[in-house]
Amino acid sequence: MTKSFCSTGLRWLWLVVVVLIIDLGSKFLILQNFALGDTVPLFPSLNLHYARNYGAAFSFLADSGGWQRWFFAGIALGICLVLTVMMYRAKASQKLNNIAYALIIGGALGNLFDRLWHGFVVDMIDFYVGNWHFATFNLADSAICFGAAMIVLEGFLPNAAAKKQA
């Protein structure tokens, strides 16, 4: 028996496209309007700042000679594949998990595109307090973090199946 597309979590793949459009659009605007290192204050504690990340989160392995580009690309592809299979196996009604998976896939694909096209990930969000600056990040990173937080949150919510048995 085959599942219909709309009955599975794949129904939420449209969110992947939304994340990709917003992420790649923001990166395009930065690349077109900023020189590397340029900073524009937006609000107190928030700047737009063009940075290149050759590594992973917090520039992990950024200075490792180039092999990390392909390593992180492989990890991103693997994660996207696993989460897509999980969405296929999930019911469309499992909204929280499917939305979380879609956010993570969209963010991973946005950063994967950067890695493969440019050789680095474009980062532009600079959050700071006083002289302390958090690592510069982008909207794809935000989507991945929100998705991961939603998965953790889902683990703390009561299970609907457990409620029916009680």
UniProtKB/Swiss-Prot annotation:
InterPro entries for the chain: Peptidase_A8
Top-level taxon of origin: Bacteria
Chief localisation class: membrane
Pathway it works in: Protein modification; lipoprotein biosynthesis (signal peptide cleavage)
Reaction catalysis annotation: Release of signal peptides from bacterial membrane prolipoproteins. Hydrolyzes -Xaa-Yaa-Zaa-|-(S,diacylglyceryl)Cys-, in which Xaa is hydrophobic (preferably Leu), and Yaa (Ala or Ser) and Zaa (Gly or Ala) have small, neutral side chains
GO cellular component: plasma membrane
Residues the record marks as active site: D123, D141
Residues passing through the membrane, by range: 12-32, 70-90, 102-122, 142-162
UniProt key word tRNA processing: no
GO biological-process terms attached to the record: proteolysis
EC code: 3.4.23.36
Pfam families found in the cross-reference section: Peptidase_A8
Keyword field: Aspartyl protease, Cell inner membrane, Cell membrane, Hydrolase, Membrane, Protease, Transmembrane, Transmembrane helix
Its membrane topology: Multi-pass membrane protein
EC primary class: hydrolase
Compartment(s) where it occurs, according to its Swiss-Prot or TrEMBL record: Cell inner membrane
Biological role stated in the UniProt entry: This protein specifically catalyzes the removal of signal peptides from prolipoproteins.
HAMAP family (alphabetical): LspA
Family: Belongs to the peptidase A8 family.
Protein name (Swiss-Prot/TrEMBL): Lipoprotein signal peptidase
Taxonomic placement: Bacteria, Pseudomonadati, Pseudomonadota, Gammaproteobacteria, Enterobacterales
